[in-house]
Amino acid sequence: MNSQVLVSRPLAPQSVPAVSLPVQSAQVAQNTGPHSSSGLATAGFRTAKYLHEEWQQGNLTTFYQAFSDRDQSEKGRHESKQLVAETEARAQRSQADCTKSLGERLLDIHFWKSELSREIRDVGAETQLLVQQKVRLERALDATDIPFTIATDNLKCRDRRRGSELVRDDVEMQLLKEVDLIRNVQELLKRTLDQAAQQIRQNRDAKEALEMDYSDKAEAYEFDDKCGRYNNQSTDIQFHLNSSKYEDNTSTPESWAQYTHENIYKAERERMASINLRSLIDSILQDISEDLQAQFDAIAVDFEKRCRELEDAKQKLEMHLKKTLEEIGGQEKNIAALKQAINDKSPPLKVAQTRLHERSYRPNVELCRDHVQIRLVSEVGELTDSFDALKLKLEESEQSLRNLEDTRMSLEKDIANKANSIFIDREKCMTHRTRYPHGMKLLGYQ
């Protein structure tokens, strides 16, 4: 049986590969073990053969080195594969992000183009209207006396607004303008001609700036739209080594948006000034006794607009108050739930601590830091952390409830102030202004 096994095994190599032997230091260690030589000449020194323990140690060293090399190689292959996947995903993600950013940029440019186009139309239309008013102003009649009492009474009534509602809004500005017209109608008529001419020039300058900005954005839109269509299969893409460098004259997204915003703001400011000037011209083009009809109409519009703003703000405040009250109720329930949760954590903590306490009386070597002991300590820590988290959240919720109560009182105060302002503007001022005189003299064509 043993001979068959030996025959079936592969033959041992018949020769030893020729390799250079490592140079060993000429150190001879004493061999006092049972395998020492029996010759007298070598007594006290080991033979040239290795011990069996040394042979085993050498094999173990070789095995460990082979395992270490394989493990290091496998780790390197895994890291290489992971790096390839990460770089590919990063490249795709970066390109997708850039394409998305280009799309968002196109939306931004389109938005500002639309705003510029709208403002260009509005400024152009307003300029034409102002030119017509200037022609009427050149042949206007002297103004007449205006109902001074109504204007001053409106101002006095609106001074009784409370809190933050005591604001100098468009209505108040128009009323002050009306009073000033009564006192300075003759002088105002002479100054308005020059003012109208100046406003027309400013409107045209603002419109020119808007048109230049619109032209630049239209060109930029074409470039970004072209860039957004590029992909890895595009045939007209190539390397541009210096393309990633920033130009010295580039703008930031903030300054880019701010530039257009300022242009639109300036145009709107000039347009609003032009609207106000036309309203003023309408007033001074009237007969002296009835000159304020146009101003009356403008004030009526502003009053109505202001009342709508107040009512809209009041409705929104009432909506926020309703939601705040609902949130107060929800927060109160949340606080109750947190308190209950804190109370519910007491029994588990008592159980865990009691278990630890009882197990501390185990005798002698039985007082072992076993898995149960470690898990009980961990459980106490977890429950303590839960206690702390719940208490912290309870404090935050109680502070939130106090903040909600403060907000509720502030909302109720604002609602009352706005209701008072609506009463003053609609019931007091607008009702009083229904007594304003009307007639053909107010048309300003005589």
UniProtKB/Swiss-Prot annotation:
It comes from the Eukaryota. It is found in: Cytoplasm, Cytoskeleton, Cilium axoneme; Cell projection, Cilium, Flagellum. The keyword Lipoprotein does not apply. InterPro entries: Tektin-like, Tektins. One of its GO terms (biological process) is cilium assembly. Pfam families: Tektin (PF03148). Keywords: Cell projection, Cilium, Cilium biogenesis/degradation, Coiled coil, Cytoplasm, Cytoskeleton, Flagellum. Residues 182-215, 297-346, 378-422 form a coiled coil. GO terms for cellular component: axonemal microtubule; microtubule cytoskeleton; nucleus; sperm flagellum. PANTHER family: TEKTIN (PTHR19960), TEKTIN-4 (PTHR19960:SF12). Belongs to the tektin family. Microtubule inner protein (MIP) part of the dynein-decorated doublet microtubules (DMTs) in cilia and flagellar axoneme. Forms filamentous polymers in the walls of ciliary and flagellar microtubules. Contributes to normal sperm motility. This is Tektin-4.
